[in-house]
């Protein structure tokens, strides 16, 4: 017999016998969370790579266009449904990227005009970013100042590897799309 756990409205973990396997990971504040490990695998040709959870299960697949200008990426969930489309907007003075989510919403990453260090901003994201977005070490907060996700870059890897912890699963698709877009922009900037 297996035990399952869930959180009741007060945030207390409730355990009950079940024939199905259900696993919740809790952060120190008692919130349910999902953790993903993302390894950068961008190349200039067509690419396809998986984003796995902390148990090694494939939750998302990223597929890049082949010989398409401007290059675009499509993110699929584990069932093969489109989660988002990432594309570079052509014919702009400074680089700008659009991320369209499957629910019809979209947000943008755009380069700001600066003289010393590259700076980017996210427009229409609906979340506040705290930390350094380009070093992949930041938190995303909602309008009530609740942390909905945390992204941290892991050191000592041959490729860019980062951990994505999502505390509110309703934001999973948006957070994964944002991270893939940031990684893509970072790859383009380092190759230019």
Language-model features: where?
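Intrinsically disordered, low-complexity segments enriched in serine/proline and basic residues
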Residues: 4-8, 15-22
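Intrinsically disordered, low-complexity proline/glycine-rich segments
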Residues: 15, 22-192
């Amino acid at each position: 017999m297996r035990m399952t756990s869930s959180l009741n409205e007060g945030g207390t973990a409730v355990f009950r016998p079940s024939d199905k396997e259900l696993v919740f990971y809790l952060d120190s504040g008692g919130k349910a969370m999902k953790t993903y490990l993302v390894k950068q695998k961008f190349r200039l040709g067509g690419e396809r790579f998986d984003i796995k959870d902390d148990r090694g299960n494939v939750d998302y697949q990223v597929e890049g266009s082949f010989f398409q200008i401007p290059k675009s990426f499509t993110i699929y969930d584990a069932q093969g449904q489109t989660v988002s489309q990432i594309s570079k907007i052509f014919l702009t003075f400074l680089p700008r990227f659009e991320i369209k989510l499957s629910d019809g919403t979209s947000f943008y990453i755009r380069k700001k005009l600066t003289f010393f260090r590259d700076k980017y901003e996210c427009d229409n994201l609906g979340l506040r970013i705290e930390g350094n977005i380009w070093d992949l070490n930041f938190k995303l907060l909602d309008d009530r100042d609740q942390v909905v996700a945390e992204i941290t870059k892991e050191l000592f890897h041959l490729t860019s590897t980062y951990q994505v912890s999502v505390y509110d699963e309703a934001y999973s698709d948006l957070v994964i799309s944002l991270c893939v877009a940031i990684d893509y922009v970072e790859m383009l900037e380092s190759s230019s």
